[in-house]
């Protein structure tokens, strides 16, 4: 029985670009819900493979929204999104220079998200998958 379990785990090479793209979309959509964002608009619907090397591709997704408090500053909105993201999926900060976009990655899901609120009261989130096998 142990040999069967060991062999069955060998074929799992991780998600395809399509699978990771669907996960990315779900994470960003859920993030907007958890942030209680208003007037959410998809800026990049994703869902298509972008070639990035030998039989591999990546996918993207992005959205913008408004905050209930239009005077909320971009850095504060990014921090709010960061807090909400922790209840959506495990991402780690890879770049946060303060008063600038926050870049996060998930090794588990093979995705990257950038929190980049551009102006007072406006959320902006975009992301992409790693370069993964095409589906």
Write out the residue ranges for each language-model feature.
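Sec-dependent N-terminal signal peptides
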Residues: 1-2
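C-terminal motif of bacterial Sec signal peptides marking the signal peptidase cleavage site
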Residues: 5-9
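Functionally engaged cysteine thiol sites
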Residues: 10, 48-57, 111, 129-133
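Terminal, regulation- and interaction-focused segments at domain boundaries
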Residues: 10-16, 51-83
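Generic structural signal for short, solvent-exposed loop/turn connectors between secondary structure elements
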Residues: 13-14, 45-47, 97-98
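Compositionally biased P/S/T/G-rich terminal and signal peptide-adjacent segments
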Residues: 19-62
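Generic preference for hydrophobic/aromatic residues in regular secondary structure cores
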Residues: 42-43, 58-67, 115-116, 125
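Extracytosolic low-complexity repeat regions of secreted or lipid-anchored proteins
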Residues: 71-135
């Amino acid at each position: 029985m142990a040999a069967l379990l060991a062999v069955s785990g060998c074929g799992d090479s991780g998600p395809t670009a399509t699978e990771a793209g669907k996960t990315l979309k779900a994470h960003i959509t859920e993030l907007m819900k958890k942030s209680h964002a208003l007037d959410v608009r998809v800026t990049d619907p994703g869902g298509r493979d972008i070639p990035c090397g030998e039989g591999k591709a990546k996918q993207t997704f992005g959205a913008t929204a408004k905050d209930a408090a239009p005077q909320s500053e971009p850095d504060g909105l990014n921090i709010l999104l960061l807090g909400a993201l922790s209840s959506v999926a495990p991402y780690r900060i890879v770049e946060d220079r303060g008063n600038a976009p926050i870049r996060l990655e998930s090794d588990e899901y093979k995705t990257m998200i950038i929190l980049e609120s551009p102006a007072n009261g406006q959320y902006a989130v975009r992301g992409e998958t790693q370069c993964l096998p095409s589906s």
